[in-house]
Amino acid sequence: MISRSYTNLLDLASGNFPVMGRERRRLPRVMTVPGNVSEFDEDQAYSVSSDNPSSVSSDRMIIVANRLPLKAEKRNGSWSFSWDQDSLYLQLKDGLPEDMEILYVGSLSVDVDSNEQDDVAQILLDKFKCVPTFFPPDLQSKFYDGFCKRQIWPLFHYMLPFSADHGGRFDRSLWEAYVATNKLFFQKVIEVINPDDDFVWIHDYHLMVLPTFLRRRFNRIRMGFFLHSPFPSSEIYRSLPVREEILKALLNSDLIGFHTFDYARHFLTCCSRMLGLEYQSKRGYIGLEYYGRTVGIKIMPVGINMGRIQSVMRYSEEEGKVMELRNRFEGKTVLLGIDDMDIFKGINLKLLAMEQMLRQHPNWRGRAVLVQIVNPARGKGIDVEEIRGEIEESCRRINGEFGKPGYQPIIYIDTPVSINEINAYYHIAECVVVTAVRDGMNLTPYEYIVCRQGLLGSESDFSGPKKSMLVASEFIGCSPSLSGAIRVNPWNVEATGEALNEALSMSDAEKQLRHEKHFRYVSTHDVAYWSRSFLQDLERICVDHFKKRCWGMGISFGFRVVALDPNFRKLSIPCIVSDYKRAKSRAILLDYDGTLMPQNSINKAPSQEVLNFLDALCEDKKNSIFIVSGRGRESLSKWFTPCKKIGIAAEHGYFLKWSGSEEWETCGQSSDFGWMQIVEPVMKQYTESTDGSSIEIKESALVWQYRDADPGFGSLQAKEMLEHLESVLANEPVAVKSGHYIVEVKPQGVSKGSVSEKIFSSMAGKGKPVDFVLCIGDDRSDEDMFEAIGNAMSKRLLCDNALVFACTVGQKPSKAKYYLDDTTEVTCMLESLAEASEASNFSMRELDEAL
């Protein structure tokens, strides 16, 4: 383990650092780059970048956050450090296994001189298992005060930079500082990580690009990310100039956590609209398929530490704080607000709502008191000073209008308040009010509920039933979990004022019922429950890491790891040519779009080069060549007229022609297309109401495609259409299927797989059982062909020793065992096979002439 921290930050940022790691024994693993399965060499086995497991068998958790869970103070020239008991990152260890070692990587809340950094790092590592990250002051300012607080924080809270003074326009230099800082965190993680035994849990928006640095270095690292702030809707997020870079960086995690479904839904929508990714929900788990990896989406609001609050409550009693406040507010009904000085906390809206209640319900004048505690601002900026001025002006106005000797309706506290005193306020408050206009979670209501439950048998224990009341903004993360709270739209000041009156006027019995319901939830869904649940899901989603072959692709933040079956490998042209030459009866099945022709090609007709290669292959008597496509038979017949001996399976095999001179035959079970009269009007209706969609009318099928429509609306319409068509076509001999941006209705039993089996069966029936199969395709419909080849072997439609090459175009998850990168490689392979056939035919002619 590393014992010293780096001080040369220029070397660190540029990546010039020594590779160090814990010693480990060598074990065979699947390689992380394309190639054969083998053991790593000695250098790889002892490199920190290796994916080999260590000799240490127990798991370890590395928690990476912007701030370490430490308090630091320098006294008389020496440093003093202690745990910050209120830090979430310290509290979450309660939910992790007792034997799991925990390391923390993060920065300190104080500046440390460069000549002291090594000594401080050693102390923190030895005594606290913390690895500090140190930054130059200018980088820290650009990273935290600049990009994090002026750009990401406002945007994630739905504030667009309409002007230079409103949220801050995008500054490329601040983004570069953000990336550089994330890279420094990465350098610290690799000092201590054992990539095969450790879990890495990254926290919050400060470190959103860190997953890319770690995934690039360690392809199989087990890594989770949790966002503690809101995630904005796609309409807001898309305004960020580096939107795709951040999304792709987050997707290098294995598990991404959010507090609420709304935040997760916004993230999934952004991935759909900006990256074209689709998510699936299986058995209660949401996952995004991303280049062979499943990125899990976790929805779990964080909880509080019950033990910590109980301890503080006990201490508050010992100090007499509770009794002191009860005496001070005797005869008054206390409402309580505790917020950071932040433009999103809605503090002034709360004051206006209190003013509204006092104006509309005079009976509360002289009785109701709102105690508003304001914590220091975490960020800097003109917005904070403006909102502070508004709050202070509202307090003066309301107290001036409704106050009297011995009574102030608003008690505004903007000086530091100890946690013991805050807990005492929780005890005496009849209602806690949270009016944030946007907030990630906000645990104030949870803390209040626990404090109102009290300590059994204590001096502050309520006589009679426990009760509490909440008025909570519907825009905070904890709101969905508190069904007994009065939810408000804080922008509607009048309605919020009425909610305050309702909360204070509610019967004690009703308050008791709501309190009991809330306490049951809060006490069972604490921070330990949250961290334990996250780790369990992270373990589940990473269980197959070492069963797949992984390699990295892309540069910069376009980097991603492709994870595929270890048996999935690139088709070697020399090897297949060698096997091709030895075969006596060959079947070659080729998809068209995306296989012989690029998908984005404007001219869809095959090139003369491709036609020449196919024609040469058809001239070989050992070959049976088929184009198997979803296209109509008219266009395919026209394009492949020069290849007289080529077979064509059109419309996914509904129509089949064995060669150019033969007639078309149908492979469907039914020739009745009356169902089209039902389907076409339905599709037309959805086309008219879905901009960007269209209908493709084939002889045997109807396809509704929405590739150019709004992804979210198109997907919604497709799902509704699918259900509608399945209902009205229940008694028709058709199959209704959804695909990649399509809904297709076609006759039952029609697929590329079924026509492939028919071809193999026919060749076997003619005494030419196939001993060589080459099948190439690029999309979902071609997966049926790949599956049919396996079925043909078990059904003995092929020779027992048949050589089978199922090949997909592009490196992606597939039932095929081989891949070629693109259509150019497919053409090169066809050229090599054609040359082999021509050479064989030439040899045969020479032999005939010699005889």
UniProtKB/Swiss-Prot annotation:
<comment type="subunit">
    <text>Binds to the phosphopeptide-binding site of GRF/14-3-3.</text>
</comment>
<feature type="modified residue" description="Phosphoserine">
    <location>
        <position position="5"/>
    </location>
</feature>
<protein>
    <recommendedName>
        <fullName>Probable alpha,alpha-trehalose-phosphate synthase [UDP-forming] 7</fullName>
        <ecNumber>2.4.1.15</ecNumber>
    </recommendedName>
</protein>
<dbReference type="Pfam" id="PF00982">
    <property type="entry name" value="Glyco_transf_20"/>
</dbReference>
<dbReference type="InterPro" id="IPR023214">
    <property type="entry name" value="HAD_sf"/>
</dbReference>
<dbReference type="InterPro" id="IPR003337">
    <property type="entry name" value="Trehalose_PPase"/>
</dbReference>
<keyword id="KW-0328">Glycosyltransferase</keyword>
<feature type="region of interest" description="Glycosyltransferase">
    <location>
        <begin position="59"/>
        <end position="540"/>
    </location>
</feature>
<dbReference type="InterPro" id="IPR006379">
    <property type="entry name" value="HAD-SF_hydro_IIB"/>
</dbReference>
<dbReference type="InterPro" id="IPR036412">
    <property type="entry name" value="HAD-like_sf"/>
</dbReference>
<dbReference type="InterPro" id="IPR001830">
    <property type="entry name" value="Glyco_trans_20"/>
</dbReference>
<dbReference type="Pfam" id="PF02358">
    <property type="entry name" value="Trehalose_PPase"/>
</dbReference>
<dbReference type="GO" id="GO:0016757">
    <property type="term" value="F:glycosyltransferase activity"/>
</dbReference>
<comment type="similarity">
    <text>In the C-terminal section; belongs to the trehalose phosphatase family.</text>
</comment>
<keyword id="KW-0597">Phosphoprotein</keyword>
<feature type="modified residue" description="Phosphothreonine">
    <location>
        <position position="32"/>
    </location>
</feature>
<comment type="similarity">
    <text>In the N-terminal section; belongs to the glycosyltransferase 20 family.</text>
</comment>
<dbReference type="GO" id="GO:0005992">
    <property type="term" value="P:trehalose biosynthetic process"/>
</dbReference>
<keyword id="KW-0808">Transferase</keyword>
